[in-house]
Amino acid sequence: MTQNTVIVNGVAMDSRPSQPTHINVHIHQESALTQLLKAGGSLKKFLFHPGDTVPSTARIGYEQLALGVTQILLGVLSCALGVCLSLGPWTVLRASGCAFWAGSVAIAAGAGAIVHEKYPGKLAGYVSSLLTLAGFATVMAAVVLCVNSFIWQTEPFLYIDTVCDRSDPVIPTTGYGWMWRSEEIQRQKEECRAYMQMLRKLFTAIRALFLAVCVLKVIVSLASLGVGLRNLCGQSSQPLNEEGSEKRLLGENSVPPSPSREQTSTAIVL
């Protein structure tokens, strides 16, 4: 430790001994747990954010295409079952023609979904959603009519075998010939009743199959509507995501203050 002498106005004065310089450096470093949590948050944002990842958009497109093709197939099957129902006895279900118009709207909705997948856009999305809503409404009406035919419209099917009950022809025969003719007519009636019973079961199975197809169309319509709305929401939020990405890029280009510089404090004592 040195001591300096300073002369002021001819008077010698001793200066204070110089003190050593102390520099205190504090360095703050984030813990490994904090870095792990930040990495997990970045991974979650990468996986579940709908507007930033290409696989998510492609997956939605494949789902929409598959649902559209399924709607078309179910619509064609509904029209085919309508043709089968038109060959049966008269019922409200047959007279309404619900199998045809429900199938036609389902085909239109499926075609709209495929067009929307091939040419994405807001207008195509709105048209596809409207067609899907129309298909859902028509298929719900078809379900109501089909259930009503099972509950209340059973009379034509219960008495379908009455066509076999006819009066026996009057044939002037006697003895063995008359007995043989009567047995032949009875046998024909039994065969007719058996065939009519089979036909009644067949039309009941067709109605049950049509009801199952309608239920499947309800499920597919709801799924297609959900995928379409999610796609529309993703397209609406895409400009906001692009704006946020530009802001993040601009923020990265500017030089931010270093955390180590903020946390580092230097104390110089003279």
From Swiss-Prot:
Main location: nucleus
Cell compartment(s), UniProt: Nucleus membrane
Transmembrane segment boundaries: 65-85, 95-115, 127-147, 209-229
SS bond partners: none
Gene Ontology CC annotation, any one: nuclear membrane
Domain of life where this protein originates: Eukaryota
Key words, A-Z: Differentiation, Membrane, Nucleus, Phosphoprotein, Transmembrane, Transmembrane helix
One GO-annotated biological process of the protein: negative regulation of dendritic cell differentiation
Residue ranges, annotated region (Disordered): 237-270
Protein's membrane topology: Multi-pass membrane protein
Keyword Chaperone: no
InterPro entries linked to this entry: CD20-like, TMEM176A/TMEM176B
In-chain residues carrying the UniProt-annotated modification Phosphoserine: S236, S245, S254, S258
Biased composition (Polar residues): 260-270
Function: May play a role in the process of maturation of dendritic cells. Required for the development of cerebellar granule cells.
Membership in a protein family: Belongs to the TMEM176 family.
Protein name: Transmembrane protein 176B
Species per Swiss-Prot/TrEMBL record: Pongo abelii
